[in-house]
Structure formats: C-alpha cells, structure tokens
Amino acid sequence: MKFVQLPDVQASNPDVMVGLTRVGVTEVKKMVEITRSDKRPIILIPTFDIFVDLPSYRKGANLSRNLEAIDRTLEEALNQPVYRIEDLCVDVAKRLLETHEYASNAEVRMHGEYMMKKKSPKTGLECQEVYDIYADAIVVRGGIIRKTIGAKVIAMTACPCAQEISKETAFKKLAALGVADNVIAEFLDDMPMPTHNQRGVGTIKIESGNDVKVSIEAIIDIIENSMSSQMYELLKREDERYVVHSAHKNPKFVEDCVRTMAKNLVRKFPSLPDDAVITIEQVNEESIHRHNAFAERMATFGELKKEMLSNGPVL
C-alpha cells in the first residue's frame, strides 16, 4: 500500500510574519501524586496550561501533534516521584523544548486544589480543608529557569472601624448607667464589640530561580494566620464562640492583612534570594457594601526585607 506524503502546512511561512509569544493548549487535567517522605502521598487533579513560543517564519505549531507530545511529556514526568509541583512544571517545560526545536522558551502553568487536615480550635474535631494552589515555570533555551509557587486561602476578617464606633457607643452607654471607667475598660478589653465581617481571600505567589525550595503548606499557613481568624469547615458551638471572639479581638483592614503577610513571609523564609519576586494580594468580600476591598504588594524579596527591617526586628 502506497502512502501519500501530506504537506506540513504548519511548517510553511505565514501570510503575516509575526512571532507569537504563546501557542499551546489549556485546561489539560492530569492526576499528580505528590510524594512526601514522612507521610502518605497527596493526590491532586490539577489543570495545566502549556505553551511554547512560535517564531515569525512558522505558520503553526502543529497543535494536534503538539497536544500528543504534551500529553506524552506529562505522562513521562508523572511516572517519576514528584516532590514539588513547581518542579514538575519545570520538568515538563524542559521536555517541551526538547520536543519543539523551533521554540526558544516554554511555559507551564498549573492550578488545582490542595487538601489539608485541620482540627477545630477548641473541640479538636478533625476535618478536611481545601486550598487553591498555583505553580508556574518558564524555561528559556540555554538554561534560564524561573518558577512560581503560590496559594489562595479564604479566612475571616473583622472591620476595625465599625468596631471602634461600637466600642465608643458602649462606653458612653455604660458610663451613663454609672459603671466606673476602669470597669468599662476592663470589660471592653475582654469582650470586643460587634463589627461587620468579611470573607477574606489572601494570595501569595513567590517567583524564583530553579534552586529555591518553598513549602506550599508554609505559604498557606502564612496567609491563614495573617487575617483576623482562620476558617473551619466543621465547628461545634464552643469552637464557633472561640472563632468569633478571636476574630473580633484581632480586627484587620484589608491593608493590614497584606502587611501582616509580608512580615510573616520575611520571618518564615529569611533565606529567599533577594531577586525572588513576591506578590501578595488580599480581597475582602464586604458584608455591608456591594463592593469588595482590595490591597496588593509586589516587590522583590530584597526590597521587602529591607523595608521590613527598617521597621524593627521581624524574627
């Protein structure tokens, strides 16, 4: 049987000779097993976006064969132990450059859900909490590698402004009833006044070179502990009382959350290289407004560390 050699249209010249930054596929789902030395492995089903650049002289990237190559690349990478999701992205990007000789760089993005076990604060009930995690890798032919790891966490915030108004009102009311000022102050210190709450959404992303190792669980911990209170999937009444009381004892503006995350990040990762790029973002979903509150800080780690140290010790 004689086979007809079909033309490779994608390898021809395009009508408009313009290079493309990214060509590839998105929403590719794969199962990933994260190996842990002292614990059971974690199973993720993340979504990948996978790209290579396309030179101006090439019409297309042979997407049908490209997808086949990407799928094979992922399968080969996933057959090996995976310890960090960002390193998996780096490995896939390297393999893509081996497959696509015309590309000068490859990029792999990943997002998924990460499950962690957690206990309620007072009764110790165990439950599973879900966190959004992110990883990204860019590999340039010739050896330049940049990778990103990050997480998004939902927790609780309490508004300081409305609380101060409630506190002032309570003080005047109790004083009018004849309660001594020192007794009022002691009461208000122990029983924080009501305020409106927000569901806070905090995000930290750390971009660095290939030799840097950052724990995703440490990032999650930083975000959770930078708001007024953590959230829990399962709470009994004693837990609920504790969470509400704790949040109102620790009121925070959206700006406070970002600044606290920055401080905790510098404290947790003091050995990060100065050229690591840090993105910290907080969105507070308002309960008494139709809008949301937003704050962000982007800086190199060196810039952030210098600014933090100018305020005094952070360790």
From Swiss-Prot:
One Pfam family in the UniProt entry: GCHY-1
Single biological process term from Gene Ontology: tetrahydromethanopterin biosynthetic process
Claim: 4Fe-4S is one of the keywords in the record: no
Residue(s) at site: May be catalytically important: C159
Enzyme class per UniProt: hydrolase
Signal peptide per UniProt: none
Cofactor(s) the protein requires to work: Fe(2+)
Record key words, sorted: Hydrolase, Iron, Metal-binding
EC number: 3.5.4.39
Pathway connected to this protein: Cofactor biosynthesis; 5,6,7,8-tetrahydromethanopterin biosynthesis
GO-annotated molecular function: GTP cyclohydrolase I activity; GTP cyclohydrolase IV activity; iron ion binding
Entry's cofactor comment: Binds 1 Fe(2+) ion per subunit.
Catalyzed reaction equations: GTP + H2O = 7,8-dihydroneopterin 2',3'-cyclic phosphate + formate + diphosphate + H(+)
Gene3D superfamilies: Urate Oxidase
Classification via PANTHER family: GTP CYCLOHYDROLASE MPTA (PTHR36445:SF1)
Family to which the UniProt record says this protein belongs: Belongs to the GTP cyclohydrolase IV family.
Entry function: Converts GTP to 7,8-dihydro-D-neopterin 2',3'-cyclic phosphate, the first intermediate in the biosynthesis of coenzyme methanopterin.
Subunit structure: Homodimer.
Protein name stated in the entry: GTP cyclohydrolase MptA 1
Source species of the chain: Methanocella arvoryzae (strain DSM 22066 / NBRC 105507 / MRE50)
